[in-house]
Regions:
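N-terminal beta1-alpha1 cap of cysteine-dependent amidohydrolase-like domains
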Residues: 1-55, 60-67, 122, 178-192
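Hydrophobic anchor at the start of a short beta-strand
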Residues: 23-25, 72, 164
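General beta-strand structural signal in soluble alpha/beta enzymes
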Residues: 26, 74-75, 159
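Redox-cofactor binding/interface segments in oxidoreductases and associated redox assembly factors
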Residues: 41, 74, 167
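Amide-donor transfer/coupling interface in amidating biosynthetic enzymes
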Residues: 105-192
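Short glycine-aspartate micro-motif
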Residues: 3, 72-74, 130
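Cofactor-binding loop segments of dinucleotide-utilizing enzymes, especially the Rossmann-like FAD-
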Residues: 6, 77, 169
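Cysteine-nucleophile active-site neighborhood
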Residues: 46-120
């Protein structure tokens, strides 16, 4: 299982994936994409990640791999990178275009506005405790996008389109919360 390792919560995602029995590989260059069963795009700072993706020549190969069927799961900044349309970002920001959705950066406010909430999540029996840190929000979804979870006021915060999944929040930041990653690993197994 690959974890995009340019910036952000790489170690936290690796820890959860390993707890679930997955082998992990840090992805920093195009050749690191070879042979992966799936890839996690961690949270962090989306414009920084965008710049680094382009500098490493990874933006095109990553988009191509996901388009060709590589399962992908993006959290927070990863959701932003996966979306087809992003509001409140730089014009030159990388858009992998793998998720037919409109996403607004920092939709819930600044760092001081970070919050936690328990969410009903499609495919998971009990509520998921979600940590939102300068989180994006999905404002529109295409016809093939399934909404998996909403924030307490109805905002879309988790989605899936085929082999691509994304959350506004950080399940990797909640000790013992492995169920969202487990759902993604199931998606990867279904594609194998």
């Amino acid at each position: 299982m690959g974890v995009l390792a340019l910036q952000g919560g790489v170690a936290e995602h690796e820890k959860v994936l390993r707890q679930l029995g997955a082998e992990t590989r840090k992805v920093r260059r195009p050749e690191h994409l070879e042979g992966l069963d799936g890839i996690v795009l961690p949270g962090g700072e989306s414009t920084t990640q965008s710049t680094l993706l382009r500098m490493e020549g990874l933006d095109g190969p990553l988009a191509d791999a996901i388009t060709a069927g590589l399962p992908a799961y993006g959290t927070c900044a990863g959701m932003i990178l996966l979306a087809t349309t992003v509001l409140d970002t730089r014009e030159d920001a990388v858009r992998l275009g793998a998720l037919d959705a409109v996403v607004r950066r920092n939709a819930f406010g600044r760092q001081i506005d970070s919050f936690e909430a328990d969410l009903d999540f499609t495919g998971i029996d009990d509520p998921v405790h979600a940590v939102f840190i300068r989180a994006p929000q999905v404002t529109e979804v295409g016809p093939d996008v399934e909404v998996l979870a909403r924030a307490p006021h109805g905002e879309i915060v988790a989605v899936r389109q085929g082999h691509v999944m994304a959350t506004s929040f950080h399940p990797e930041c909640q000790d013992g919360e492995v169920r969202v990653h487990e759902l993604f690993l199931g998606l990867c197994a279904d594609r194998a």
